[in-house]
Amino acid sequence: MAASAAAAELQASGGPRHPVCLLVLGMAGSGKTTFVQRLTGHLHAQGTPPYVINLDPAVHEVPFPANIDIRDTVKYKEVMKQYGLGPNGGIVTSLNLFATRFDQVMKFIEKAQNMSKYVLIDTPGQIEVFTWSASGTIITEALASSFPTVVIYVMDTSRSTNPVTFMSNMLYACSILYKTKLPFIVVMNKTDIIDHSFAVEWMQDFEAFQDALNQETTYVSNLTRSMSLVLDEFYSSLRVVGVSAVLGTGLDELFVQVTSAAEEYEREYRPEYERLKKSLANAESQQQREQLERLRKDMGSVALDAGTAKDSLSPVLHPSDLILTRGTLDEEDEEADSDTDDIDHRVTEESHEEPAFQNFMQESMAQYWKRNNK
């Protein structure tokens, strides 16, 4: 009933209409997968079945019904064999390959948003592989850019009874919060083994944590004491819930915190994402305008150079122009040229015929006078 009430409260408060994405992170052995299994069963029992995504390519069996399973897309063993990688390298490469198709996953989530109020994403056991990889960043930012996204950090309470180990977990939680910049919930799992009240006391009471540290005599305790002062402000705004993934206790409080985190996303994180998207769009449009302006200037320069070259070369005819000019002379000019040629030809012939005729007449007269004198 808590899940349904939280969802109804979220809708009534004008909260997000999209499904809330719960990105489950945690150290290996902290109980992430068991937590997702319990969460899935709880939501099914409440009549609000979640949309579940498994991003662990190395898991042998998934103990919950997954709508999308990375193992159906990427074969972890084949990736290791083909690229000659170890276990962690195989997980990173598998996530990288899957991230190239994550736009299709986003489309599936959008189609299912009317049927599912929550999207559960189970990540690989090697937390650093997902948190600090490029593919993990792509997946996280893709979800956060479209849907209310909450990071759930699952912590093994039974292994955090030592102040130094507890501080290490808190430092890792702080680094993930700083990296993702999303609403954050620390789930202290395995409360069926040990109650998480000691951890809450350490977070709220600095002196109680100092008393626990005084029992440690190693040099690490001095470093932990210094870091606890730095993280004191971090604790004040941190959402903490104690949960038993085996027994299912603490889930009601968890969904109350999820509702609060989703409202925080809509109130603080979504405007920031919209501002970033708008600034990126403005920068892109400005870049396009600058490119168009440079192109316009280049085209104007080319046109000006072409006009200058044409003016400077106008007295000189192109060979094609010469051919056209020779082929389009006026007929009168052609006839005049032809008549002139004929006159010149006749004048030349007459000039040669007149001396020959005079010689012929002289020879004839000479012969005539010669015959008469005889």
Curated annotation (Swiss-Prot):
It is an enzyme of class 3 (hydrolase). Expressed ubiquitously. The modification Phosphoserine is found at S301, S312, S314, S338. The modification Phosphothreonine is found at T328, T340. Pfam families: ATP_bind_1. A motif (Gly-Pro-Asn (GPN)-loop) lies at residues 86-88. Its EC number is 3.6.5.-. Belongs to the GPN-loop GTPase family. This is GPN-loop GTPase 1. It comes from Homo sapiens (Human).
